[in-house]
């Protein structure tokens, strides 16, 4: 559980106001300000000092019991609260201790609805709390997000209720987006002044995900309705796709809290990467003793079984191949081996295909200090959850990759919580694929180590989507919501001109040093290795450094970075710092200041950087050891699609 240090708590009551005029709230550092007005509906305006950043207008629920809060609702009371505490996360995604400081306004309306608004130094969040008897049918949740029309939006535009959430980011001015265009969260808005506002949500339970829809002028809240009928004729990968919907978005308890609507604010691009509002606004850990949860690296067989060489067995989904991959994991200290798609007998998760003895494989892995994970589909796993988990536990399975959820309605969001809770009962970790973005579930159930919801490395098998331009948006947008399963570290590297599609052995668009650096930049307590194990044996020098990069961190320092162009950061694990920088297809000279180290103190630095010919052959790299001093400024040269990564240790 989080260990808290709770600071000042202030309360005041304003009894039975007929109409609440504008109420103001300031962030702890008094830079951000919120002005709340209640007329026909609630509106919130957010300012940075005296400059308006954005507004949220017409906040209400449309339900079978009318509007909540009621139109022109009377306010019974207003309370304020100030919190200053330190939160210790179960899994150290960014740092070992998180500072949480906010000021809160809480409105109680005559219909017993509450509206809570929090201002952090890093942004604003609001949510509703209802107090109704019985069940509540919600037809829609309204909110108009008002930004300057010339503001630029970065988000995944999508019109599919069965979305896989793997679209590249589209960069477009609000005024140029056509009315009716929809897209999913997180969405980044850069207003004309250059300030960034990242739209997120947290504590999503028993409710659909929030999307965006372009209205006549503004961005509006959009939700997918509850499913009525499904595709019943497909396979287990698409059988739960929605064909028709009900006329409501949710049926839920009338007495509940609703998800937090989150707006992260950052003056500089680099500050987005350090924002943790989604985590802080999520429910606290629900697992009594989470000490069994083990983050780590994963090697898996999806591409690898089609790319092995220098072996004396027929590669495939079989016991011999699995043991070879487990030996590789043991040789390099990798925690997990994952069986991906293909290991099950037909559509029965309790049985394996011929030639694969799961119990023998797991026992062998255990003897080598390696844990085994299994890939499953949403449809099969949801139907067989109890029987499957019992069988997996008997085999000794330690984790699951759950794929092809491809939905964000209320029923689907409930599945995430159900799967996390049931997996925790069997002490199994989870990785969601075909999944919507993180929403705080990982704080309540830290066995949810990572998830997809991005254009990740596998897209290189048949598209150009995972290019450095899109990839360098991820740390500022997708990764702010929570861990992302990008799958870094390919040894099959290509320049922009040499890149080709190859589904069985995909190439990565960028240099060797770029993809090694992505293991520091792409934040995830579970990192996957994409390539065949044979390739990693061949490139042992790179492999050893790569898989020694931690997946948990004690501290983060963001360095000079620009959305979509270049990223630089330093992360600390124990006494070691890892520093990484990557660029888009533009070659770049960067200066990295070691200001996070004590000035003048000497350190040893191990570096992997772009080789002199990396612009021609992306596999070209230079490995060297250098002595550096705290406060020193390093000159770093990056090839097109290039990278630089270093480990800094005490002498």
Describe each PLM feature range:
Residues 329, 403, 430, 521, ...:
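Conserved, mostly hydrophobic/aromatic
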Residues 249-328, 332:
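An acidic-aromatic substrate-binding cleft motif
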Residues 22-279:
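N-terminal accessory beta-strand-rich subdomains and adjacent acidic, glycine-rich linkers
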Residues 563-601, 644-645:
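Carbohydrate-binding surface patches
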Residues 1-22:
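Bacterial Sec-dependent N-terminal signal peptides
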Residues 625-651:
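C-terminal beta-strand-rich structural cap/linker in extracellular carbohydrate-active enzymes
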Residues 339-511:
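Aromatic- and carboxylate-enriched substrate-binding clefts and catalytic-loop regions
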Residues 531-578, 582, 615-619:
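Glycan-recognition and catalytic regions of carbohydrate-active enzymes
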